[in-house]
Amino acid sequence: MNIGVLNSGGDCPGLNAVIEGVVGAASRRGWNVVGFYDGFEGLLSEEGDDRFEWLTPAGCRGLRAKGGTILGTVNKGNFAIKVGVGQKGEIEPAVLEKTKATVKRLGLDALIVVGGDGSQSTALLLAEIGLPVVGVPKTIDNDLGATDVTFGFNSAVAIVSESLDRLETTANAHQRMICLLYTSDAAD
């Protein structure tokens, strides 16, 4: 069996851990895993312009301890759809056809999509054209309706809390100081 994995949307802690876990579990079952670079955009690979890599347990060992994602991630491009609750986005038919061609060329039996609300909406559209898809919810915003908490959120909260604690110590050491901590704007 051949399965694909991609990260889509914004970066968050835990993406590499998912990749390592997928590759390890697949390997124990005798399956092959292809990782797509730059989210869904990697699905638009053409012969000679491969935007993917066949992943091995040896090549992924230790990833869970590293931030970011070895595959890269994109929240714009050919697959970017913004939808509200209960609304459905669309992807250009030519993009879907190129996606089907890549899936067929690689002999993929399924695709694992690690992403937030927009990414999971795109995954649904791919499932509707016949590609078996497994969605792994992730978001630092914790705004996915079907989950209580997603990975990425707890890590983001912990890092912001620790940063605030450190800033408080610095601010208390000086009589006239204003400290600002900038974080992601979930509205973007």
Regions found by a protein language model. Give the residues of each.
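A cross-family phosphate/adenosyl-ligand binding-site feature
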Residues: 1-8, 18-107, 114, 118
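Conserved small/polar residues in nucleotide/adenosyl-binding loops
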Residues: 182-188
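Alpha-helix capping and helix-loop boundary segments enriched in small/acidic/polar residues
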Residues: 10-13, 90, 117, 147-155
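Active-site glycine-rich loop that binds ribose-phosphate moieties when present
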Residues: 95-96, 155-170
